[in-house]
Each structure stands twice: as structure tokens, then as C-alpha cells.
From Swiss-Prot:
The extracellular C-terminal domain controls the voltage dependence for amino acid transports activity. Polyubiquitination by NEDD4L regulates the degradation and the activity of SLC38A2. It is a multi-pass membrane protein. Disulfide bonds join 245-281. It comes from the Eukaryota. This is Sodium-coupled neutral amino acid symporter 2. GO terms for biological process: alanine transport; amino acid import; amino acid transmembrane transport; amino acid transport; cellular response to arsenite(3-); glutamine transport; L-glutamine import across plasma membrane; L-proline import across plasma membrane. Inhibited by N-methyl-D-glucamine. Inhibited by choline. Allosteric regulation of sodium ions binding by pH. It comes from Bos taurus. Residues 97-102, 178-188, 239-292, 351-371, 435-436, 496-506 are extracellular.
């Protein structure tokens, strides 16, 4: 360990003065679910730039001198916004339809504030613990168990994100092909079957890109994804004023939805909207039903960006914890508004008949709309190019765990890549609904990354604050809240699965 490495923090003494332990992992930089952050060392073998576990740069004789951040404040805000926004935005209208407007806003506010608070804990823990690597903080706090827990949570979150992207391909690509080919009768056409199309896209497009040894241009897909989601938001708002609320929406959703969804609307009778035709298009503010349990996991899934916080912090020009918190506040507030508007206008368009993937709901009432077709194409391109970015850190983590001391092997590289893709494709084919991905990952990995791990690391590693201090008591309360959220949400989701299993309720 070298003392010079700690100089790279460049923390203002008046702000973060504390005794740091040394750390050899500050050269770390990796892509999140949306972004591939630029590495300091472009010449490092990509497979050895460990994205999920501690870097083994001892073998590479690099300088560990003071390294100031080079990314501007505005670009850091953009990078963090890229890391936050993801496919979860497509499920927010469904969450609002099962909570009501007022309850959704309350939950969204609390989840965003809690997520921001966990960023505060994570940054302070990084300074005290002397590491800018999430998993290394786990190792410093709880040894190998902490390291594996952090690594496993991030890997689960990445697999969930990748699955949600492929679900979008499964849902939307058949509709795009149908619209482009002007096909009326879809019965028996294999190229309109979502399962076949996911396999085809994975084999022809995603696999070759995923086999690359470095990310290259794929790193720019983060910006493309954010732009696509902003375009999606604009279209959602515009369509609210173009689509009147037809009384027959429920019929349309159940009868005309494309076969790429596995029983897509069978959960509608259980949604708790017992209304007449006259009030079917009236907004509701508080709703409690069997699907309300998915709201918090969907929201937590949508706000996970914590593995990207430390790399962005490392790159920040004029690096200080206060400056990074300002970056986080602006990014979280921007995404809060974006999520709220997308959920609100999507809900006010379809009310209680929103599907778990909002974009697919439009196919029930506007099958041939050109603007929606453009949105679908943009989203499909973005998510298809993002999947290899997400595979990269998962593969690096597995390689490090299983073959850390071995030289690079194309055979091993290919087998791990194919295995990840096969596993994810099986999830997408056999898990009936994207809501289940949002719910399960949001209740497990996302809850770990937002609530449990940052607070646990803070309690363990920040030594200068006594356990009876307000800060430690707050962190302890946050930890307990995370455990309650995770166990409660998981239990209710499993109960919902069991309850609906006989009738195929998903």
C-alpha cells in the first residue's frame, strides 16, 4: 500500500478532514446499467480493469501519484443522470395506477430522498474507509463476506437491468416489425414471436458486441439512452392530449395486445379498479390492491445508481464531498421530475389499464402511429446497444472470482459471455412479465445497494463518530428501514406469485 495513493482524493481539509487508510483501487472506473465511465488507463487490458471487484494493478506498474479529477460539474451531472435513468421509467405509470397519484408522489419523494441520503453515506464512508470502490468498502468493513455481498448485489442489479432491456425487445420489436410490414393477421408468424426475436437479436447483434475485449464506442450509448428516454417522455406527454379516454380501453388491452406478451393483461381484473364506465377515466389518489406491493421495488429499481457514484466522484474536477453532493442533488431532482411526469401522464392516458411496460400499452389504441413507431425504434436501438455495456462488468466480476490469476483466454471469455446471455434469455422467455423483474430486483439487489450496504459500511467504517451520535443513529435507522423494505416487499411479492400462480395471474 502506498501513501501517495490517498493524495488522489484531493478532499478539502475543511470539509473531509479525517484519517484515511491507504487504498490501491482508485484507478477503478466501470459502466453502470446505463453508462460506461471513461477509464484513467486506456492501455489496461479491459479484462483486467476489474469493474466489480478490486483492481489488481500491482501487476501493472502504473503511477499512483496524485490524480485530480478532469470531468466538469455539468458533465458529472449528465453522467450521473445517465446512471440513474433506465428501463424502470417504463414501469412507473403501472406503479402509479396501483397506488394512486398522491400515494405515488409520496413514495417517489421518499425513495428519492432516501437514495440521496445513501449517496451521502457512501461518499463519507469512501473518505473514511479510504476506497473509491464499492466492493472494496465491503471488504474493508466485513471482509470477504462484505465484498461478495456487494459484488453479488451489483451483479444481480446488472442482470436485472439486462433482463429488463431484453424484455423491451421482446415486447416492442414484434410491434415494430408488424407496423413496418403492415401485417394484419399475426397468427403463426414466427418473426412476430417475441421469444424468437429476443434469441435472434441476442445471437446476431448482442453477442458479437459483447465478445469485444473493450467497450469502445459502446460507452457512448449512455448518452443515447438518456436522449431516447427524454424523447419517450415528450411523446408520453403529447399523447395524453391526443388520446381521449375511451370506455373500451380495457377491452382493447385484453383483446388486441400482441402475442409477444405472455397473458399481458390477465392481471387487470385483480387491480382493484371497480368502477363504472362513467368514472373509468377519473384519476384516483390512493389505491391499495394486490399489485400495490410492486410500487416500492419498481421505484427503488429506478433510482439505483450507487455503483456509479464513486467512479463519478473520482472523475469530478475540483473533487470534494460537498461538490459531489451538489452533483447528486441536481441529478436526482432532474430524474425525480422526469419520473414523475412520465408516470403521471402515462397514468392519465390509460388510468387503471396501464400495462407493466407503458410503451406497449399504446399498441392497444394506436397500432400504426408513426411517432410511437419512432419512439419504439429509438428505445430498441438504445437498449440493444446497452446490453453489451451491462454484460462487461458482470463478465469481469466472474472472471476475477474464478480465474483471477490466469492469463486472458478467448475460449473462457466467450464461454462466460455466452453463459450470461443464455441465462438472461431464459429469464426473459420464462418470466411472464417485466413487472416481476422490476419487483424482484428492486426488492432485493436495489434495496441492498440503496438502503442496507451504504448504511452498514458507514456504521462499520466511520470510526470518528460514536454509535450514540445522531449520524450513527440515523444510519442505523436507515439500515433497519432497508431490511424492513427488502424483507417486506420480497414476502409480499412471493405471496402474490403464489396467489396468482394457479390462474396464471401474471
Amino acid at each position: 500500500m502506498k501513501k501517495a495513493e490517498m493524495g488522489r482524493f484531493n478532499i478539502s481539509p475543511d470539509e473531509d478532514s479525517s484519517s484515511y487508510s491507504s487504498n490501491s483501487d482508485f484507478n477503478y472506473s466501470y459502466p453502470t446499467k446505463q453508462a460506461a465511465l471513461k477509464s484513467h488507463y486506456a492501455d489496461v487490458d479491459p479484462e483486467n480493469q476489474n469493474f466489480l471487484l478490486e483492481s489488481n494493478l500491482g501487476k501493472k506498474k502504473y503511477e499512483t501519484d496524485f490524480h485530480p479529477g478532469t470531468t466538469s460539474f455539468g458533465m458529472s451531472v449528465f453522467n450521473l443522470s445517465n446512471a440513474i435513468v433506465g428501463s424502470g421509467i417504463l414501469g412507473l405509470s403501472y406503479a402509479m395506477a396501483n397506488t394512486g397519484i398522491a400515494l405515488f408522489i409520496i413514495l417517489l419523494t421518499f425513495v428519492s430522498i432516501f437514495s440521496l441520503y445513501s449517496v451521502h453515506l457512501l461518499l463519507k464512508t469512501a473518505n473514511e474507509g479510504g476506497s473509491l470502490l464499492y466492493e472494496q468498502l465491503g471488504h474493508k468493513a466485513f471482509g470477504m463476506v462484505g465484498k461478495l455481498t456487494a459484488s453479488g448485489s451489483i451483479t444481480m442489479q446488472n442482470i436485472g437491468a439486462m433482463s429488463s432491456y431484453l424484455f423491451i425487445v421482446k415486447y416492442e420489436l414484434p410491434l415494430v416489425i408488424q407496423a413496418l410490414m403492415n401485417i394484419e393477421d399475426t397468427n403463426g408468424l414466427w418473426y412476430l414471436n417475441g421469444d424468437y426475436l429476443v434469441l435472434l437479436v441476442s445471437l446476431v447483434l448482442i453477442l458479437p458486441l459483447s465478445l469485444l475485449r473493450n467497450l469502445g464506442y459502446l460507452g457512448y450509448t449512455s448518452g443515447l439512452s438518456l436522449l431516447c428516454m427524454m424523447f419517450f417522455l415528450i411523446v408520453v406527454i403529447f399523447k395524453k392530449f391526443q388520446i381521449s379516454c375511451p370506455a373500451e380501453i380495457a377491452f382493447l388491452v385484453n383483446e388486441t395486445v400482441n402475442s409477444s406478451l405472455t397473458q399481458p393483461a390477465t392481471f387487470l381484473p385483480d387491480m382493484g379498479f371497480n368502477r363504472t364506465e362513467s368514472d373509468s377515466c377519473q384519476p384516483r389518489y390512493f389505491i391499495f390492491n394486490s399489485q400495490t406491493v410492486y410500487a416500492v421495488p419498481i421505484l427503488t429499481f429506478s433510482f439505483v445508481c450507487h455503483p456509479a457514484i464513486l467512479p463519478i466522484y473520482e472523475e469530478l474536477k475540483g473533487r470534494s464531498r460537498r461538490r459531489m453532493m451538489n452533483v447528486s442533488k441536481i441529478s436526482f431532482f432532474a430524474m425525480f421530475l422526469m419520473y414523475l411526469l412520465a408516470a403521471l401522464f402515462g397514468y392519465l392516458t390509460f388510468y387503471g389499464h396501464v400495462e407493466s411496460e407503458l410503451l406497449h400499452t399504446y399498441s392497444s389504441v394506436m397500432e400504426t402511429d408513426i411517432l410511437l413507431l419512432i419512439v419504439r425504434l429509438a428505445v430498441l436501438v438504445a437498449v440493444t446497444l446497452t446490453v453489451p455495456v451491462v454484460i462487461f462488468p458482470i463478465r469481469s466480476s466472474i472472471t476475477h472470482l474464478l480465474c483471477a490469476s490466469k492469463e486472458f483466454s478467448w475460449w473462457r471469455h466467450s464461454v462466460i459471455t455466452v453463459s450470461i446471455l443464455v441465462f438472461t434469455n431464459l429469464l426473459v422467455i420464462f418470466v411472464p412479465n417485466i413487472r416481476d423483474i422490476f419487483g424482484f430486483i428492486g426488492a432485493s439487489a436495489a434495496a441492498m445497494l440503496i438502503f442496507i450496504l451504504p448504511s452498514a459500511f458507514y456504521i462499520k467504517l466511520v470510526k470518528k463518530e460514536p454509535m450514540k451520535s445522531v449520524q450513527k443513529i440515523g444510519a442505523m435507522f436507515f439500515l433497519l428501514s432497508g431490511i424492513v423494505v427488502m424483507t417486506g416487499s420480497m414476502a409480499l411479492i412471493v405471496l402474490d406469485w403464489v396467489h396468482n400462480a394457479p390462474g396464471g395471474g401474471h
